[in-house]
Amino acid sequence: MTSAAFDEILRRLVAAGARFVVIGGLALGARGVVRATKDIDIVVAPDPENLKLVAEVAVAAGGHVQRGEALLGTPFSIAAELASGEQMAIDTDLGRLDIVQGLEGVPSFDELLSRATEAEVLGVNVAVCSVEDLRAMKQAAGRGQDLVDLENLDAAAG
């Protein structure tokens, strides 16, 4: 997916009034590390109204989630699945939106938001996790790309 498609997902989430914090590859970009990313990683406020807003934006963008034999593609079904507190990858016509929740090493929405700063990501002003939180999440994940990201984050910080 192109950054223009990611831009549109972010615009729609902001326009809907959804509360979220950007993490992952796009957060790295906001912190001076440029690299390709295949998805938008966000942590969302877990209250039912916010989950409904996120689900509505995803479904309006052609969003669906495959869960075994079931294909979830309505705001209600996606919001209900989000309410379970599990991580969810939503494939939309604009790209993949990863809702990160309940993973070890990932702070809660409230914790992330309290340390986040507003930054421009692909031309959209959004809450972006702090460098410290980003570093901690990358260390906790510990995959090869995460270790490279840590090195690049340190280099960008000077």
For the regions a language model picked out, list residue spans one by one.
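Compositionally biased terminal segments of proteins
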Residues: 1-158
